[in-house]
Amino acid sequence: MWLLLAFLSAALLGFYDVFKKKSLRDNAVLPVLFLNTLFSSLIFLPFILVSAFAPSVLGGTMFDVPVVGWEVHKFIVVKSFIVLSSWIFGYFGMKHLPLTIVGPINATRPVMVLVGAMLVFGERLNLYQWIGVMLAIVSFFMLSRSGKKEGIDFKHNKWILFIVLAAVAGAVSGLYDKYLMKQLNPMLVQSWYNVYQVFIMCPIILLLWYPKRKESTPFRWDWTIICISIFLCAAD
C-alpha cells in the first residue's frame, strides 16, 4: 500500500511540474509563487482551525493538527525558509529551461538525500542504493552532454545553477524532515510550514517585485496556478 502511495505521489508531482511550467510561461515568477503558497495554506487552514477550536472532530485521525507552542513552531519556521529557498530557485530556473532538462535534474534529489543521510545520520547504503547513486551521476553527465545539443551549457547557464541549488535545498529539506518527523506530527509540520511561507513571501513581494513590477514580466492570472497548490498538497 505504501509503495502504491509513493508512486501516486510521484505521479501527482509530475502533474505539479507541468502546471508550474504552464503557469510560469510569460509570467512573473514571484506572484505565481506567492499565490501557490497562499492557496496551499488555505487548503490546510481548515484543519488547523478545526483542530484548535473543535478538537473532537479530527482527534485521532491523520488530519488532526496538534496545538503546540513556539518551542515547536520555530523548527517549522526553519523548514519554511528552506523549502521557500528551494522553490524560489526552482521557479526561476523552470521558467527559463525546458522540462526535459529540469525534470531529470530534480530526479537527482533523492540521491542527494541518500548521500546526506549517510553523512549526517550515519546511515549505510546497500548495494542497490550505491548503484542508484552511480546511475544518477552518470545520468547527470549524459544530461549535460545532451543539453549542449539544445544550446544549454551546464557550466555557464545560471538557470541550470538555480535548478541545482533548488535540488540541493530540496534535499536539505528532506533531511530536515527526517529530523522533524522523529518528534513532530506530520500534519502539524505540513500545515504550518505552508502558513509561514505566506508570511515570508509577503515582504518579498512588497519589497522585491511590487516596486519594479512595471519594469519586468507582467503578472497574468492563470487557473493552473491553483492546480499547482492542489497537486502539490495532494502529493505531500
Question: Where in this protein do the model-derived segments appear?
Answer:
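Juxtamembrane helix-loop boundary signature in multi-pass membrane transporters
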Residues: 1-11, 111-171, 178
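Helix-coil boundary and interhelical linker segments in multi-pass alpha-helical membrane proteins
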Residues: 1-2, 50-60, 70-71, 116-129, ...
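Short helix-kink/termination motifs in transmembrane helices of multi-pass secondary transporters
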Residues: 14-19, 84-89, 115, 168-179, ...
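Active-site phosphate/pyrophosphate-handling residues
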Residues: 22, 100, 179, 187
